[in-house]
Amino acid sequence: MRILLANPRGFCAGVDRAISIVERALEIYGAPIYVRHEVVHNRYVVDTLRQRGAIFIEQITEVPDGSILIFSAHGVSQAVRAEARSRDLTVFDATCPLVTKVHMEVARASRKGTEAILIGHTGHPEVEGTMGQYNNPAGGMYLVESPEDVWQLEVKNVDNLCFMTQTTLSVDDTSDVIDALRARFPAIIGPRKDDICYATTNRQEAVRSLAADADVVLVVGSKNSSNSNRLSELAQRVGKPAYLIDSAGDIQESWLQGTQTIGVTAGASAPDILVQQVIERLRLLGAEGAKELIGREENIVFEVPKELRLEVKTVE
């Protein structure tokens, strides 16, 4: 058996920034640091930060006065921001800048009274934060997940509509929903480029190439990671068995029976150490070598807030 590695895979710039914000806050201010929701959707990352003194909460009422609070990479609603401002808290925002871009699109629509339709997954924290940027009762904010949702949707004014998307969706599925929106509402206005982020798009392209050459695909990522789930689904859609795994310990030998080539990739919130552990586990099971495929180069970096840059640490 041989191992093929998707390229790119693993951490994106937004995840890297979010984790760095928590790590630097811990270095500067010391534990405990409170984080609203899991900073990124990866069990290993969250457990590691928890061991260092991060406390993950869902309600700001759980945070004591005078504490440090960090918003997760998924973003928060205007109501959550207002609640945090009303408290004696020092707040750092780890929202991915590409999610913030979508927030600004929604806020702009809200100010204009333009009805807004978000393509996204119900219950996902990014969706909750994005929907929570709209507060104009004269307009409206709607969530759709599928073309069927679009055809059932009723709006106030079909001539005053715009749409935006969650950043971690399936590129193919989203294209189908956008086609339905344009067919149902011909006057609808969308972003110049859809809001699915570069990392999501690149990793889906990479897993498509990987699946073409692999007999089975292993996706390193947690079950609550939207982008990791999309990678597994995409590999299955092109006809290859695919398994979403949190760690090397999840691998079942039965998955590898009769396989010559094992494809390995990782979601945008999965650290490389987990991929290396998967490679080691596969070698113990008889795989030889690990070849990385040629892929799209990524060199995007998002800065942490200036208060957390190491060269300006002033708190003892």
Swiss-Prot record:
Q: Where are the transmembrane segments?
A: none
SUBUNIT field? Homodimer.
What residues sit in the active site? E126 (proton donor)
Q: What is this protein called?
A: 4-hydroxy-3-methylbut-2-enyl diphosphate reductase
The protein's role, per its UniProt record? Catalyzes the conversion of 1-hydroxy-2-methyl-2-(E)-butenyl 4-diphosphate (HMBPP) into a mixture of isopentenyl diphosphate (IPP) and dimethylallyl diphosphate (DMAPP). Acts in the terminal step of the DOXP/MEP pathway for isoprenoid precursor biosynthesis.
User: Which keywords, in A-to-Z order, does the entry hold?
Assistant: 4Fe-4S, Iron, Iron-sulfur, Isoprene biosynthesis, Metal-binding, Oxidoreductase
| Species for this entry | Sodalis glossinidius (strain morsitans)
* Gene from which this protein is expressed: ispH
Biological pathway? Isoprenoid biosynthesis; dimethylallyl diphosphate biosynthesis; dimethylallyl diphosphate from (2E)-4-hydroxy-3-methylbutenyl diphosphate: step 1/1; Isoprenoid biosynthesis; isopentenyl diphosphate biosynthesis via DXP pathway; isopentenyl diphosphate from 1-deoxy-D-xylulose 5-phosphate: step 6/6
User: Which parts of the sequence bind isopentenyl diphosphate?
Assistant: H41, H74, H124, S225, S226, N227, S269
Q: What is its EC number?
A: 1.17.7.4
Q: Which residues bind (2E)-4-hydroxy-3-methylbut-2-enyl diphosphate?
A: H41, H74, H124, T167, S225, S226, N227, S269
Q: Which residues form a coiled coil?
A: none
Residues noted as binding dimethylallyl diphosphate in the record, renumbered to the chain: H41, H74, H124, S225, S226, N227, S269
